[in-house]
């Protein structure tokens, strides 16, 4: 073989090597790119805000885990687009109304609700996303942040004096009355009373979404689940799914604020009979700084899951206030009043469980909605508040 032929062969071989190397490098780069984005599991684009609801993160509360030797996790419902677990409820109530023909997408429609918590905000956001209007009746002592947010969202707000459920002017009754008046007006505008306390769309959405998410995120390894109870939808839906559907033998605990009747109902069965749920007895509003949970009557949503609740733990306002400050300082979790209640209960439950057990609590909403009431007091708590101080108040 001549020298020139030899050089040509070497040149061709070298080019082939370069080509093969380029292909391999490209393939490797493509593989790494694929693995990077597959691992990160970046979600697809959403068609609207309503599609962002659900699939909320589960995060370990490191300070409480370290203090107890039990893994304590918070299901961050505050990460929903309108900021609370009530986003799920609002969306499911409205979608159910659409399925029944009570609301029609693209046509004028109003959603009425009576709420002292975050449900009104969730309804306002979902209504705006789907083309409806929101009318919210609430106690006139509702936190200023929630009032301002509702008004900023364009909801019609009807403030009423706090009253017993048997009072026709109580906020739930006021919402139902306003809805009926619009229906009777004859102007053809559709109107729906959300009725979160009695509407089964409430507990069902937690059975269909929140419960399965928790089971998946914990791989079914959950020893205790803790939630407060206002309407009863969250604790019923999640507990019913975990115990009945997933067959997970976890201990379900209802965390109850001072002044609420669920503690006695769950532990001693003495609130009052289910047949009296419509409120034949006059009762005052639950006496607590906590918003969104606690009640002195039995709702349909609570009734549907009562048999799945094993225990109730009562938490007072001082414990809740201190726990909120503790979580903010030690974990960077700026939470609302009901989440603080759940966290206090988690510490109590952790004492009864073996080392390394898993507890999940619901983190309902952010402290930003409680600045003028709950956090007005919580911010005054000493920065170095200890867990012992929280529990022993």
Swiss-Prot record:
InterPro entries reported for this sequence: Cys_Synth/Cystath_Beta-Synth, P-phosphate_BS, TrpB-like_PALP, TrpB-like_PALP_sf
GO molecular function: cysteine synthase activity
Residues reported in the UniProt entry to bind pyridoxal 5'-phosphate: 230-234, 338
Modified residues (N6-(pyridoxal phosphate)lysine): 86
PROSITE patterns tied to this protein: CYS_SYNTHASE
Statement: the UniProt record of this protein carries the keyword Transferase: yes
Reaction equation(s) it catalyzes: O-acetyl-L-serine + hydrogen sulfide = L-cysteine + acetate
UniProt GO BP: cysteine biosynthetic process from serine
Keywords: Membrane, Mitochondrion, Mitochondrion outer membrane, Pyridoxal phosphate, Transferase, Transmembrane, Transmembrane helix
Entry's transmembrane regions: 12-31
UniProt enzyme class: transferase
Membrane topology: Single-pass membrane protein
Cofactor needs: pyridoxal 5'-phosphate
Compartments in which it is found: Mitochondrion; Mitochondrion outer membrane
EC number: 2.5.1.47
GO cellular component, one term: mitochondrion
UniProt miscellaneous comment: Present with 4650 molecules/cell in log phase SD medium.
Function description: Putative cysteine synthase that catalyzes the conversion of O-acetyl-L-serine (OAS) into cysteine, the last step in the cysteine biosynthesis pathway. However, this CS-like protein is unlikely to function in cysteine biosynthesis. It seems that in S.cerevisiae cysteine biosynthesis occurs exclusively through the cystathionine pathway and not via direct incorporation of sulfur into OAS.
Similarity remark: Belongs to the cysteine synthase/cystathionine beta-synthase family.
Name this polypeptide is given: Putative mitochondrial cysteine synthase
Organism whose genome encodes this protein: Saccharomyces cerevisiae (strain ATCC 204508 / S288c) (Baker's yeast)
């Amino acid at each position: 073989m001549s020298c020139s032929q030899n050089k040509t062969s070497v040149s061709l071989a070298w080019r082939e090597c370069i080509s093969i190397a380029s292909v391999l490098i490209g393939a490797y780069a493509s593989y790494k790119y694929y693995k990077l984005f597959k691992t990160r599991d970046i979600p697809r684009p959403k068609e609207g805000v309503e599609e962002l609801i659900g699939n909320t993160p589960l995060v370990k509360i490191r300070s409480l885990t370290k203090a107890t030797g039990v893994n304590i996790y918070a299901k961050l419902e505050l990460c929903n687009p309108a900021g609370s677990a009530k986003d799920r409820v609002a969306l499911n109530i409205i979608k159910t109304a659409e399925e029944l023909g009570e609301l029609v997408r693209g046509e004028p429609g109003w959603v009425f609700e009576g709420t002292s918590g975050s449900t009104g905000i969730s309804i306002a956001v979902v209504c705006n996303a789907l083309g409806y209007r929101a009318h919210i009746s609430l106690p006139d002592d509702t936190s200023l942040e929630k009032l301002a947010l509702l008004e900023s969202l364009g909801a019609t707000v009807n403030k009423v004096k706090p009253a017993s459920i048997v009072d026709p002017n109580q906020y739930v009754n006021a919402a139902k009355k306003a809805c009926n008046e619009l229906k009777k007006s004859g102007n053809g505008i559709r109107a729906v009373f959300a009725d979160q306390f009695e509407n089964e769309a409430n507990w069902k959405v937690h059975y269909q979404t929140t419960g399965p998410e928790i089971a998946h995120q914990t791989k079914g390894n959950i020893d205790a689940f803790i939630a407060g109870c206002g309407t009863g939808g969250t604790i019923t839906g999640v507990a019913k799914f975990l115990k009945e559907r997933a067959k997970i033998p976890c201990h379900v605990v209802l965390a109850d604020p001072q002044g609420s009747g669920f503690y006695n109902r769950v532990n001693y069965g003495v609130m009052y009979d289910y047949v009296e749920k419509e409120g034949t007895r006059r009762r005052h509003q639950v006496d607590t700084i906590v918003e969104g949970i606690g009640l002195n009557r039995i709702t349909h949503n609570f009734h549907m899951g009562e048999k799945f609740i094993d225990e109730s733990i009562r938490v007072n306002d001082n414990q809740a206030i201190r726990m909120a400050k503790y979580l903010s300082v030690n974990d960077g979790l700026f939470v609302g009043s009901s989440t603080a209640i759940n966290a206090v209960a988690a510490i109590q439950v952790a004492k009864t469980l073996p080392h390394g057990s898993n507890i999940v609590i619901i983190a309902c909403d952010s402290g930003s909605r409680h600045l003028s009431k709950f956090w007005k007091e919580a911010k005054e708590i000493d920065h170095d508040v200890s867990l012992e101080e929280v529990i022993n108040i």
